[in-house]
Design a protein with these regions (language model features):
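DNA polymerase sliding clamps and clamp-related checkpoint/processivity subunits
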Residues: 1-26, 31-160, 166-261
């Protein structure tokens, strides 16, 4: 396919990660701007109720084909975007493009090589105000890596009883707590449990309570990556991140809840 009239174009066989990512974004955001440049795709957006910040980066070099001749903002309704991408099948590839003639439309094309079928959907782009969010660098006191499937299981289990989750790090021990549950995880010799990437003060108690709904939604990242990385610091937002297969990374940031909140 010629790219002569395309100002933005990517092609990839890594369809499952994009499919799972579209579901994750749909759950967390109503709409958002994909900022496309020659270096890749970035999204920084806050949920409609201002409760969670989502930060996504996909790197150009990780796609089989990628080109972006000028900086573009793709304003997407996340529900509509998910409805299109969820249709992709495991034996299909995905192509995204915007043409010079129609900069207000994103084309998403599925291709089945075996049957030589091209199925193209066209999404009208939205004019979404940018949040203009400046994310300052933060040095977190505890950074913990754990299995994404274990993280998902814990979040779902506790969500059956509570809408809040307390995360506490003491030394090299990590606790997940709710009013009727306490789950304690320690590092193991075979690295099958958790791993502390950093722990500034092993005697300090690092603790925060967070809205569990968004952590349950983000825990679907188990479909994207084997591990999640949890950054926690007293009186600071919680940062949870995972890789998007080998395409990039996605992070969420949650403010701690007060007893009244």
């Amino acid at each position: 396919m010629s790219n002569d009239n395309k100002i933005f174009h990517l092609w990839t066989s890594k369809t499952n990660p994009l499919k799972n990512l579209s579901e994750l974004l749909r759950d967390l955001l109503t709409e958002g701007n994909l900022e496309c440049t020659s270096k890749g795709i970035r999204l920084i957006s806050v949920s409609s109720n201002r409760s969670v910040l989502v930060h996504l980066k996909l790197h150009a070099e990780n796609f089989e084909e990628y080109s972006c001749n000028e900086s573009l903002t793709l304003g997407l309704n996340m529900e509509e975007y998910f409805k299109v991408v969820k249709l992709v099948e495991s034996n299909e590839t995905l192509r995204y493009y915007v043409t010079e003639e129609d900069k207000n439309t994103l084309a998403i094309q599925r291709y089945n090589k075996e049957e030589d079928i091209r199925n193209t959907k066209f999404i009208k782009l939205m004019d979404i105000p940018n949040d203009n969010i400046n994310i300052p660098p933060i040095s977190y006191e505890s950074v913990i890596v754990m299995s994404s499937s274990r993280f998902q299981k814990i979040c779902k289990e506790i969500y059956g009883f509570s809408d809040k989750l307390e995360i506490t790090s003491i030394g090299n021990v990590l606790y997940f707590k709710s009013p009727n549950t306490e789950i304690c995880i320690k590092p193991t010799d075979n690295n099958s449990g958790i791993k502390y990437e950093s722990c500034d003060n092993k005697d300090e108690i690092i603790q925060g309570t967070f809205n569990l709904k968004y952590l349950v939604q983000f825990s679907k990242c188990a479909n994207l990556s084997d591990n999640v990385k949890i950054h926690i610091k007293n009186d600071y937002p919680l940062l949870v991140e995972c890789s998007v297969a080998k395409l990039g990374s996605v992070k969420i940031c949650l403010a701690p809840q007060t007893e009244e909140g």
